[in-house]
């Protein structure tokens, strides 16, 4: 892509100070490393990148830092952030609205960010948060007045989507969409494959069907390392 080399020049000038500001994102060393690994994969023209990060180590803030850098560098114009349940989407939007980035501005003050409630989006929408389920309905069942184009997004970030079917079964949410776990996986794969975009996925436990889509992790930060580093307490149920 033509904006790749220009973006890498901006990355160098950007530095990571904004992401490490104690009054802002306050990212830890491994979150910066995860972002760097994703940027490196994209600079090498890879179409997919998988980041494996233990539950409770701050995937949402990592994604926020990544999105900010990509938009600030002009590397991507329109980003779809796919989550596997509505509560995670709401939590993400709250983070995007609360965390101060450059010049004390939040992401949604700098860029047009549309949440789960916004079914449609304008041409100037830069970030769109949606559930896998909502896109299955729109793409496979045409449950919308406006169809999504394959090039509507140039980057898709997926958070823990391999858990979607299990959570749906537990919560009784959208169960009719999926006959069983294999059906969920095939529809999930169809949604991911539908878009002609770079794809970055974040997961706590890389399942086989996740690596089949996104490849082996380009960065891993596991539970044991997080405990040794003092960021997670052993045997405690970590916060999501």
Which residues does each PLM region occupy?
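Conserved AMP-binding/adenylation subdomain of ANL enzymes
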Residues: 102-107, 230
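ATP-dependent helicase/translocase motor core
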Residues: 5-78, 87, 91-103, 123-127, ...
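Post-DEXD/H (motif II) to motif III coupling segment of the RecA-like Helicase ATP-binding lobe
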Residues: 167-237
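Conserved RecA-like ASCE ATPase "motif II neighborhood" in helicase/translocase motors
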Residues: 127-158, 163-187
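Conserved motor-coupling elements within RecA-like helicase/translocase cores
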Residues: 112-128
């Amino acid at each position: 892509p033509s904006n790749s080399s220009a973006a890498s020049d901006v990355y160098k000038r950007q530095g990571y100070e904004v992401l490490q500001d104690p009054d802002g994102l306050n990212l830890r060393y491994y979150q910066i490393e995860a972002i760097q690994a994703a940027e490196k994969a994209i600079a090498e023209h890879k179409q997919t990148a998988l980041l494996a990060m233990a539950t409770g180590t701050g995937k949402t803030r990592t994604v926020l830092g990544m999105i900010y850098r990509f938009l600030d560098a002009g590397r991507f114009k329109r980003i779809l952030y796919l989550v596997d349940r509505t509560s995670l989407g709401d939590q993400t939007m709250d983070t995007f609205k609360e965390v101060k980035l450059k010049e004390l501005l939040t992401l949604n003050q700098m860029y047009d960010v549309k949440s789960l409630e916004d079914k449609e989006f304008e041409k100037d929408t830069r970030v769109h948060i949606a559930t896998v389920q909502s896109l299955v309905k729109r793409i496979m069942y045409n449950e919308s007045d406006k169809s999504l184009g394959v090039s509507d997004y140039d980057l898709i970030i997926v958070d823990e989507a391999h858990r979607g079917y299990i959570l749906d079964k537990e919560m009784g949410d959208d169960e009719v969409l999926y006959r069983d776990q294999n059906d969920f996986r095939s529809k999930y794969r169809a949604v991911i494959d539908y878009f002609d975009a770079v794809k970055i996925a974040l997961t706590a436990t890389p399942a086989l069907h996740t690596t089949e889509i996104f490849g082996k992790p380009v960065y891993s930060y596991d539970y044991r390392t997080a405990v040794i580093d003092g960021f997670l307490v052993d045997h405690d149920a970590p916060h999501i």
